[in-house]
């Protein structure tokens, strides 16, 4: 991720088409490829591509749902000619800032952590990862007939948080706070 302690340069290889866009003093290199090919890279980059088939299938559905939800939101905002998205809130006592897909408008998603980790075909896609994508092609998570914003964390530390406490104040009834541990284990969050 950009400006994270694990930021590093890496040589990567991509498939698909390359589109260059000049915006002010920057040149953006955009990789254009089919959704399912993108997902093969994501599930091989976000987690171990040698994980069990069922875990890879679950991740495929989650990542596909998140991606299609973001594209749908982006298209709606373009159709409404709306630039009303702010990735921060400010009160007299605090400023809360989060990084989101809306922080870029020239392309659907990026390879940074606020979107999904995408590293092209550099990491190699295992037969199980390819099988997971193929067996779940087109499958998404729905809530009230809408594609879910299926955000996830690679490492939750034993607890998840409600959507509105991490991103914009727009609660999602399917993204709730849960403990992710053995039954009966107490988690000490006093030093968090």
Model-found features: residue ranges?
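Conserved, single-site charged/polar hotspot
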Residues: 1-192
């Amino acid at each position: 991720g950009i400006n994270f302690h694990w930021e590093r340069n890496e040589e990567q290889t991509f498939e698909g088409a390359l589109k260059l866009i000049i915006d002010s003093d920057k040149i953006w290199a955009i990789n254009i490829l089919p959704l399912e090919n993108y997902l093969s890279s994501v599930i091989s980059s976000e987690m171990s591509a040698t994980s069990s088939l069922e875990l890879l299938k679950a991740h495929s559905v989650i990542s596909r749902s998140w991606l299609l939800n973001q594209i749908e939101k982006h298209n709606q905002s373009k159709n409404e000619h709306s630039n009303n998205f702010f990735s921060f809130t400010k009160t007299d006592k605090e400023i809360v800032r989060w990084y989101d897909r809306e922080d870029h408008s020239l392309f659907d998603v990026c390879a940074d952590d606020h979107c999904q980790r995408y590293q092209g075909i550099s990491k190699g896609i295992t037969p199980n990862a390819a099988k997971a994508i193929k067996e779940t092609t087109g499958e998404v998570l729905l809530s009230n007939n809408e594609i879910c914003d299926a955000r996830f964390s690679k490492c939750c530390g034993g607890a998840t948080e409600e959507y509105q406490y991490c991103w914009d104040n727009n609660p999602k009834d399917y993204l709730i706070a849960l403990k992710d541990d053995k039954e009966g284990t107490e988690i000490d969050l006093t030093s968090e």
